[in-house]
Amino acid sequence: MKKLFIALATLCIGPTASAQQALFGGPSVESPVINADGTVTFRFQAPKAIKVEVTGDFMPVQKREVEFNGNKMTVETPGVGELKEGKGGVWEYTTPFVVAPDMYNYTFRVDGVSQIDPHNMWVNRDVASLTSVLLVPAPGERSDLYAIHKVPHGTVSKVWYPSATAGFDRRLTVYTPAGYETSKAKYPVLYVLHGIGGDEDAWVTQGRATQILDNLIARGEAKPMIVVFTNGNIACEAAPLENADGYVNPTMSLPKTMEGTFEKAFPEIVKFIDSRYRTIAKKQSRAICGLSMGGFHTLNISVNYPDMFAYSGMFSAAIGVSDPSVSPLYQDFDKKLATYFAKKPALLWIGIGKTDFLFQSNTDFRAKLDANGFPYKYMETDGGHIWKNWRIYLTEFVPLIFK
């Protein structure tokens, strides 16, 4: 089941892309351009190209059949727009529809070769894939939370902590709210976990988490809090190029993935944060959430340490993808779940997309909760296993915690 989960998660990530920028000379090409009518124009200079296309999650999705281990299933992939060549070998495509306010990832395909946009310096990495980024903000829309505004900003630090379980120091990304450095106040702590193939940078780059926190706090919609972004790959020190492995290509197939070691070691992180930062070191002032594999980790950490977190958020959680026999932490789950709820957590929050390949396992888990009368909050969105949904879930979850 875990191999199937990894394969399906891989399909949700765009292909690796690269491009070179001409630093001197050549015509100026502007791309992307958000037009006054809400459409978006993409341009790519390739005078010798035969065919240029653009694809990304701003396009309507296409459904396609895939087969894995003899099982056929339908997955959603972004649609494709074909550019037309113009003057000077500049290819252009304008969406025939208004692009809704949101944050999107896209790439070009030049004669079948994937490329990032050389005229757009905003690039994200998801595992080993590079994509160009398009942000369409609008006042009053959710995407406005993803933009940088003239509000008090928190501080983002890269912090190393000693892990006795791993046997080496490991890196965290830590957000402290505006005013932390000049205050003597203590703060609640939210721990945010990434998905398979991700790392401690994923939520800050792809997820726009620090912008979301800055804006929600500035609006008075969230309490000032410390936020800790962990690295769930217990065999790794840190994100790619930030560890002793050097120039190693990122991969989803890492040792000790979803086999209990990370969850077992999680109290090390909490202890370190409580010792280094001015935290309110008690259950009611701690929250945890995560996407996909991070949702799997969130659930198992929550039920194995029921006195640690009052708030838990599961975003497209990879429920039931590991064999209970691989770790004692995954055994006696129903008993642990009952104990977790007996201790009256403040909130269990679940979010999933209607076409997410993990939708059914999340539905089955909710049925278990319902059958036992265990309370939770639930959000169902359009779309599948995508960052668009996970950003939505974070903006919904954060205002509910530490009330």
Where would I find each of the regions flagged by the language model?
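Non-catalytic cap/lid and distal C-terminal segments of serine-dependent acyl enzymes
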Residues: 34-403
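Sec-dependent N-terminal signal peptides
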Residues: 4-13
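Short, basic/low-complexity N-terminal boundary segments at the transition from targeting/disordered tails
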Residues: 5, 20-22, 135-140
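N-terminal edge beta-strand
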Residues: 20-38
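Sec/Tat signal peptide C-region and signal peptidase I cleavage site
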Residues: 15-19
